[in-house]
Regions:
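Short, surface-exposed coil-to-beta transition loops
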Residues: 59-63
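Enriched for short, Lys/Arg-rich terminal
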Residues: 67-86
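Basic, Lys/Arg-enriched alpha-helical interface segments
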Residues: 1-55, 71
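Residue-level signature of transmembrane alpha-helix interfaces in integral membrane proteins
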Residues: 18-21, 65, 76
Length: 86
């Protein structure tokens, strides 16, 4: 599986996810690339709720990504905390 990051994702990732947690997220997506909820009307974008240490899923972050099965790639579009967007 190949991960492709947008600039905004890379910037926000450094704010929210330490390297070890980011690797956990990548490993999770490798094993379950369709885990996120499909966002209607986007052509296949998915939203994944990801828990941060001691915060659980509700207090964690949301990861927006696109899984392109034909190329075996996951495009990491953006991420945000629940407080940042609803």
């Amino acid at each position: 599986m190949v991960f492709v990051e947008t600039r905004i994702f890379t910037k926000k990732c450094s704010l929210y996810l330490p390297d070890d947690e980011f690797r956990e997220l990548q490993n999770f997506l490798i094993n379950k690339p369709n885990a996120g909820t499909l966002i209607q009307g986007t052509g296949g974008l998915r939203k994944l709720r990801w828990s941060l240490d001691n915060k659980g899923k509700r207090g964690g972050i949301r990861v927006i990504y696109y899984w392109q099965l034909s190329k075996n790639q996951i495009y990491l579009m953006t991420l945000y905390s629940k407080n940042e967007k609803t």
